[in-house]
C-alpha cells in the first residue's frame, strides 16, 4: 500500500506481535516498518497524526491536535506498548488518558454526527467507541493497582450512552 493511517496501522501491530509470540511466521520488516510509522505519527505533546503527509496539515483546530486525536492516542500507545517501543512509558499512557478524559467533550459532540469529521477538531462519530475500546486496552498496560480507577472513569462515559 502507498497510504495508511496511524490508527489502522496501530490496530494491526498487536496482532502481529501476538502472532509472533504464538510462533507464526511474521515478516520482521513489516512489523518494524509499522512500528516506525506509528512512532513517527506521534507529536510532541502527545497528539497522534491521522497519517503522515509530505505537507502537514495546518496547526490549530486540526485533526492532528490532541483534541482531534484522543482515540488515536490510545490505540497508538497500546500498539507501541505491545511492540515494546521504549517511548511508551506508564507516564506517557497516563498523560494520554488524562487528555482523553479532560477533552472528552469533543468525542461527545461528534458521537451522533452523521457526517464524518464535521465536529470540532475533525472528530468523527466512528471514533467514539473506537476511542473507548482502545482506552480500555491501554489501561490494561498500566500497573494492576491503577487499572480499577481508570476503568471506573471510562465506564462512566460508556454508561451514559447506553439506551434503556
Give the ranges of each region predicted by the language model.
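TPR/TPR-like (Sel1-like) alpha-helical repeat modules
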Residues: 20, 158-159
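An alpha-helical repeat/solenoid feature that recognizes helix-turn-helix modules
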Residues: 1-32, 40-153, 164
Amino acid at each position: 500500500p502507498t497510504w495508511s493511517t496511524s490508527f489502522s496501522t496501530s490496530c494491526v501491530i498487536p496482532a502481529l506481535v501476538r502472532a509472533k509470540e504464538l510462533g507464526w511466521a511474521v515478516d520482521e520488516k513489516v512489523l518494524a516498518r509499522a512500528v516506525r510509522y506509528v512512532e513517527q505519527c506521534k507529536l510532541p505533546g502527545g497528539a497522534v497524526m491521522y497519517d503522515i503527509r509530505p505537507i502537514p496539515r495546518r496547526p490549530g483546530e486540526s485533526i492532528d491536535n490532541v483534541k482531534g486525536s484522543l482515540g488515536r492516542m490510545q490505540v497508538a500507545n497500546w500498539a507501541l506498548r505491545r511492540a515494546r517501543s521504549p517511548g511508551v512509558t506508564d507516564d506517557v499512557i497516563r498523560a494520554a488518558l488524562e487528555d482523553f478524559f479532560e477533552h472528552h467533550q469533543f468525542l461527545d459532540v461528534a458521537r451522533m454526527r452523521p457526517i464524518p469529521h464535521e465536529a470540532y477538531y475533525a472528530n468523527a462519530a466512528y471514533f467514539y467507541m473506537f476511542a473507548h475500546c482502545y482506552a480500555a486496552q491501554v489501561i490494561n498496560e498500566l500497573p494492576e493497582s491503577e487499572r480499577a480507577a481508570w476503568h471506573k472513569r471510562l465506564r462512566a462515559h460508556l454508561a451514559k450512552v447506553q439506551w434503556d
